[in-house]
């Protein structure tokens, strides 16, 4: 028997306590990650095929440690959120007008 197995066998209460605390530690780590924000790009796929009249709001997420490129997320009238292509001429024009106002 290995020393770790022998230790666990001789301390079942400690093993039980460790198993009880494990979900708490995982939950705490997950909550901390959510607090810091997701460290990944939200927009994996973008589109330039959305008409402006279908958009109710726009959200721009700047490039940073979470993602190397800026992201433009549109909320549509049906509630769906999609990522728009920042390089599309139409969206560049919209962003320019938003920044000017």
From Swiss-Prot:
Chemokine released during platelet aggregation that plays a role in different biological processes including hematopoiesis, cell proliferation, differentiation, and activation. Acts via different functional receptors including CCR1, CXCR3A or CXCR3B. Upon interaction with CXCR3A receptor, induces activated T-lymphocytes migration mediated via downstream Ras/extracellular signal-regulated kinase (ERK) signaling. Neutralizes the anticoagulant effect of heparin by binding more strongly to heparin than to the chondroitin-4-sulfate chains of the carrier molecule. Induction: By inflammatory conditions. The gene is PF4. Heparin binds at residues 92-98. GO terms for biological process: adenylate cyclase-activating G protein-coupled receptor signaling pathway; antimicrobial humoral immune response mediated by antimicrobial peptide; cellular response to lipopolysaccharide; cytokine-mediated signaling pathway; defense response to protozoan; inflammatory response; killing by host of symbiont cells; leukocyte chemotaxis. It is found in: Secreted. One of its GO terms (molecular function) is chemokine activity. Belongs to the intercrine alpha (chemokine CxC) family. Transmembrane segments: none annotated. This is Platelet factor 4. Disulfide bonds join 41-67, 43-83. Gene3D superfamilies: 2.40.50.40. It comes from Homo sapiens (Human). It holds the Pfam family IL8. SMART domains: SCY. Keywords: Chemotaxis, Cytokine, Disulfide bond, Heparin-binding, Phosphoprotein, Secreted, Signal. Homotetramer. Interacts with TNFAIP6 (via Link domain). Interacts with CCR1. Interacts with CXCR3. Interacts with THBD; this interaction enhances generation of activated protein C. Residues 1-31 form the signal peptide. The keyword Metal-binding does not apply.
